[in-house]
Design a protein with these regions (language model features):
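Short, Lys/Arg-enriched N-terminal segments with co-localized hydrophobic residues
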Residues: 1-12
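Polytopic transmembrane helical bundles with strong interfacial aromatic enrichment
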Residues: 14-380
Length: 380
């Protein structure tokens, strides 16, 4: 869990007028986080309303999703500016970057930390959602409602909002270094003059695979929500065959991209001897492989369903399980439970509870979809 200043030290820090801090960029970034959260929430609400009430227009759902996507882009740009401009007053820039890094590794710094990798996932989801607004046609309302729900949960991971001094919701990438750690250096108003450089990117991660492997893998993860959303929407609408045609291209794309990301990880592991060769059966490696195996199996059953109208339950089970296993893999990687057993695991930022809620929520959703009462609430 992250440590912060004690109450006494925090009060002392509040009385100090610090010199040279660029607070505007961080406040702007946090504004974009809040805006993206609220816009995704409103988009989801209006899409659910449009799904539940026949004849209701989905325009407001679309507008708020587009606002959400633009806000996510704003977060991305703001955080990259903080890293690229070496604003070491921000913990994320100080902990993950340095002035000596080449541009390609400075880009890699973006997703070295948990907050940045969540944001990368959000960017891909936002882009996929925009594409679906224009291509999903009659499936748009249900599919985008589910996409918006996922974005609400992911954005909450970045809020960093303290609730009644009891619980902190998310971990903000725009947290100031002096707010995150206790150190005598922060008693000086001009402490920034002594922060000559950041700690830099882990030497093992200064590799060209770090530039292309995480974005590819996260695009693969993001793509798995699309067939999931079509499947769950079809359960709500009781259209057990029609969803296959629009969902299949997305499933194929997800299988190819996620497979490519896993292969890239294998080559990277082979080049970095500390990772144990192409494949070490590391828990995190396995956690990315299982969704891919489920997805490939699901694609085969979707093809059978499309041609013969058979294997209905199996096709649903595998497609839905694929995305749920992606969420479970994220929980294993980021909750700290594998911190002592995997070289790939992140340290715990206190997000284990939120990550588990993410998993449970999307397990609950298809269960509700197959309940007669829930279908009536949505579509009658």
């Amino acid at each position: 869990p992250k440590s912060g200043p004690s109450g006494k030290n925090l009060k002392a820090m509040e009385t100090i007028t610090y010199v040279g801090e660029n607070l505007f960029i961080g406040n702007l970034g946090h504004f974009f986080v809040v805006l993206s959260f609220v816009a995704a929430l409103l988009s989801g609400i209006f899409y659910v309303k449009a799904s539940a009430e026949k004849g209701t227009d989905a325009t407001l759902g679309r507008i708020f999703y587009i606002i959400h996507a633009l806000a996510v882009l704003g977060i991305f740009v703001t955080l990259f500016v903080i890293i690229q401009q070496h604003y070491f007053e921000y913990a994320y820039a100080y902990e993950h970057s340095s002035k000596t890094l080449a541009l390609r590794y400075m880009i890699s710094c973006f997703w070295e930390g948990q907050e940045g990798s969540f944001l990368l996932w959000m960017v891909w989801n936002a882009l996929l959602g925009i594409i679906l607004i224009f291509t999903a046609k009659r499936w748009e309302r249900g599919v985008l409602a589910i996409m918006a729900l996922a974005q609400v949960v992911l954005t909450a991971m970045l809020l960093g909002v303290n609730i009644l001094d009891i619980y902190t919701l998310g971990s903000s990438p725009f947290e100031l270094l002096r707010e995150k750690m206790q150190a005598p250096i922060f008693s000086a108003p001009n402490y920034l003059e002594n922060l000559v450089d950041g700690t830099g990117l882990n030497p093992l991660l200064q590799n060209y695979w770090m530039v292309i492997h995480p974005p590819t893998l996260f695009l693969g993860f993001a793509l798995t929500i699309v067939p999931f959303a079509f499947a769950v929407t079809s359960l709500f609408q009781k259209e057990y065959r029609a969803w296959i045609k629009p969902a299949l291209p997305w499933a194929l794309a997800g299988g190819m991209v996620l497979g490519a990301g896993i292969i890239m990880g294998g080559f990277w592991a082979y080049e970095s001897l500390s990772f144990g060769g192409y494949w070490a059966w590391d828990p995190v490696e396995n956690a990315s492989l299982v969704p891919w195996l489920l997805l490939i199996s699901g694609i085969h059953l979707m093809l059978i369903k499309k041609v013969t109208n058979g294997s209905t339950i199996a096709a649903y089970t595998l497609v839905i399980s694929t995305f749920i296993m992606v969420l479970y893999a994220s929980f294993l990687t980021r909750s700290g439970v594998l911190g002592d057993t995997s070289v790939h695991a992140f340290t715990d930022l206190g997000l284990a509870g939120q990550l588990m809620q993410f998993v449970v929520l999307f397990i609950w959703l298809p269960i509700i979809a197959v309940t007669d009462g829930a279908r009536k609430r949505w579509y009658m």
